[in-house]
Amino acid sequence: MGGQRHTMIDDAAQRRRLEAGLAEIGLALPPDRIDTLFAYLALLRKWNGVYNLTAIRHPDEMLTHHLLDSLAAVPALAEMARSSEVGGAARGRVLDVGSGGGMPGLPLAISCPDVSVLMVDIVQKKTAFLTQCRAQLGLSNAAAHWGPVERLEDPDKFAVITSRAFAELTDFVNLSGHLLAPHGRLIAMKGVYPQAELDRMEAAGLMAAWQVEEVRRLTVPGLDAERHLVLLSRK
């Protein structure tokens, strides 16, 4: 007989893997926030078929390739968002560009209630999902915006602008750089060391106004693949 195949989910085992991953990353979260992370993962699984949020379908891979992958960047994102170098209303504000299913924006907002996260995407059904998550998870520090980031205007600016699967570094800088506060940082999440992208950024003349502060290697629990954070700031 035909029919849809369903993957059995061992919630207890997934919770243990999430808790172990958080410990490995160095994120000490209270039980209620771990509950919320787990609830977000359940929403991602539930609505993926409707909203086409990710090509990854297996629950274990969603945990490693999406949730833990995003959580591995949270310490750096939160540190830069809270930086005393950033003044005014921008401090503590993060813009997640091309957020899709909410990564890394929602894991960041769940883990750090003092950080305000705006997630932007050009696909309306994805921002609808993000708005639904905000309501169901009770995240007053998260919001979603539908539309291209290059048309977004925000007078308060952002301490951190991040992207996980949005665009090349050159496009990331050109399209979202106008929203960065003085002394803020663009933080791009990449896989392998993005030397070719850095070279193209230099060839485009962007290094006259921007500098690469650091390319930081990340370790994602349970994921045997390279991950890097590219930290950019204005000169």
UniProtKB/Swiss-Prot annotation:
Protein's UniProt keywords contain S-adenosyl-L-methionine: yes
Organism of this sequence: Cupriavidus pinatubonensis (strain JMP 134 / LMG 1197)
Annotated Gene3D superfamilies: Vaccinia Virus protein VP39
Chain's role: Specifically methylates the N7 position of guanine in position 527 of 16S rRNA.
Subcellular location: Cytoplasm
Alphabetical keyword list: Cytoplasm, Methyltransferase, rRNA processing, S-adenosyl-L-methionine, Transferase
Protein's name in the database: Ribosomal RNA small subunit methyltransferase G
Enzyme class name: transferase
Protein family membership: Belongs to the methyltransferase superfamily. RNA methyltransferase RsmG family.
